[in-house]
């Protein structure tokens, strides 16, 4: 910002990043406020189909900026949407034990658990829950560790049934054919690993920057900033389900859209929107 160099961010999701008045920061991905809204839309729609079965929530988050912002956003949304938060637990990001946290959640047994955890702590939570015989009725995660490329292989049956928000899944290739083409290119350089959430978002951010540079016809930072402020990319050129890429005055993409996917038989399956 001080140097006047545009920064196109494809992956970071803290809502605060586009509330600080930056003029050179452009975020392509949905932020956690938008992802949290998606989670509550899912719960509301689930309740319509299941006689209001979901009433109580548990919020579990690591205590760095991302986890704290996510937990705070979810807590505010719960109050707004009239859900009762029976536990809101923050834990140290590099903790080696979650025994007491899991015991508290088990005692309250919320209808939905909303965790915001990085990879090692997501593994730790599921292993601890298994050890202490706690099985959340419904777990809807804020991405991160729950979409790590090694998550399913590492956790095996413990991952089954986990739901997580995401802006990408390879099964969307049925409606977004470009995913198949890009995934084939990606696998050539990844040792055969499929494209996943974070690389897909990074790719989308990079391509938005590339298009802005083409529009600017220059690598001059001010010209690129102006191009980014005016860019309007349609969904037909994207590998994510966004409606496009167009930045608001705060630098946030105004055409984002996310999905929820669930681990079923060792694979991520898109389950929402229904």
Region roles according to the model:
Residues 1-274:
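Extracytosolic ligand-binding ectodomains
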């Amino acid at each position: 910002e001080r140097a006047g160099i545009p920064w196109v961010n494809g992956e970071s999701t803290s809502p605060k990043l586009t509330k600080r008045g930056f003029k050179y920061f452009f975020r392509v991905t949905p932020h956690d406020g938008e992802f949290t809204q998606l989670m509550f839309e899912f719960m509301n729609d689930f309740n319509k189909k299941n006689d209001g079965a979901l009433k109580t929530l548990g919020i579990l988050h690591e205590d760095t900026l991302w986890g704290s912002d996510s937990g705070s956003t979810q807590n505010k949304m719960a109050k707004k949407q009239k859900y009762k938060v029976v536990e809101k637990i923050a834990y140290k990001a590099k903790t080696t034990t979650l025994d007491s946290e899991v015991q508290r959640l088990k005692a309250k047994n919320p209808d939905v658990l909303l965790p915001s955890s990085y990879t090692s702590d997501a593994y730790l939570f599921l292993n601890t829950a298994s050890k202490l015989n706690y099985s959340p009725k419904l777990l809807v995660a804020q991405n991160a560790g729950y979409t790590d490329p090694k998550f399913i292989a590492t956790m095996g049956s413990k991952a089954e049934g986990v739901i997580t928000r995401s802006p990408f899944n390879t099964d969307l290739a049925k409606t977004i054919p470009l995913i198949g083409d890009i995934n084939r290119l990606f696998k050539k350089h990844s040792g055969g690993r499929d494209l996943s959430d974070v690389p897909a978002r990074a790719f989308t951010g990079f391509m938005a920057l590339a298009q802005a540079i083409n529009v600017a016809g220059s690598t001059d930072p001010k010209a690129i900033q102006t191009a980014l402020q005016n860019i309007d990319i349609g969904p037909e050129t994207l590998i994510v389900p966004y409606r496009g890429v167009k930045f608001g005055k705060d630098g946030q993409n105004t055409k984002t859209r996310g999905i929820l996917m669930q681990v079923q038989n060792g694979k991520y399956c898109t389950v929402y929107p229904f």
